[in-house]
């Protein structure tokens, strides 16, 4: 069995409405994070910019998860798409959000082995 050591980073960047960043993050951690962990994702960072909770403006939250190797990424992605609770979470929290974006990244040194699936 091949051991997959490459780290794939799942980066959620969310801009909640003014004054809503802390409430959004609390809800994300309570409702989204447990299911993400069940799908094999490991939480590595929760960043807030600027580094204070704003009341009259929007913060930007960057939440970074990881999985090990392409098979874990595909499994996580497949499970998330088939779970109506994931879509339901994002639909329910939409009123708190100005924008959100998810991206996936890896180390350049891992690209060749990640592409060898």
What residue spans do the PLM features occupy?
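Basic/polar N-terminal segments that are highly enriched at the extreme N-terminus
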Residues: 1-5, 116-117
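An amphipathic, aromatic/His-enriched active-site/gating alpha helix that lines ligand/cofactor pockets
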Residues: 2-4, 26-45, 56-57, 66-105
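Active-site-flanking beta-strand signature of metal-NTP-handling nucleotidyl enzymes
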Residues: 8-14, 62
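Short amphipathic
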Residues: 11-13, 103-107
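Short, surface-exposed ligand-recognition loops at beta-strand->loop->(often short) alpha-helix junctions
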Residues: 16-24
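Short, solvent-exposed loop/turn elements at beta->coil junctions and helix N-caps
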Residues: 47-53
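Acidic/histidine-enriched, glycine/proline-rich intrinsically disordered or flexible terminal extensions
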Residues: 105-117
